[in-house]
Amino acid sequence: MAKTKAGGSTRNGRDSKGRRLGAKLGDGQFALAGSIIYRQRGTKIFPGQNVGRGNDDTLFMLVDGYVKYEKRRNRKYASVYQEKK
């Protein structure tokens, strides 16, 4: 005799892996050109000074320098400056 009744099957129990989005460099952090600043879907943060935007909306540094997150006209920007601001 079985200790418990037959369990049956379920159609749940799956989940997708996390996409590792978000900030990769913090405000005031120094990094080299080509470094990824922010991974995102859509333009949650816009590219500012010395920052490029990839096909998947990833923000990356165009020059060596310090990352600065700024807010202008109800938009968030990520900029890179060669001197710390």
Curated annotation (Swiss-Prot):
PROSITE patterns: RIBOSOMAL_L27. Transmembrane segments: none annotated. Pfam families: Ribosomal_L27. One of its GO terms (cellular component) is cytosolic large ribosomal subunit. It comes from the Bacteria. InterPro entries: Ribosomal_bL27, Ribosomal_bL27_CS. This is Large ribosomal subunit protein bL27. It comes from Mycoplasmopsis pulmonis (strain UAB CTIP) (Mycoplasma pulmonis).
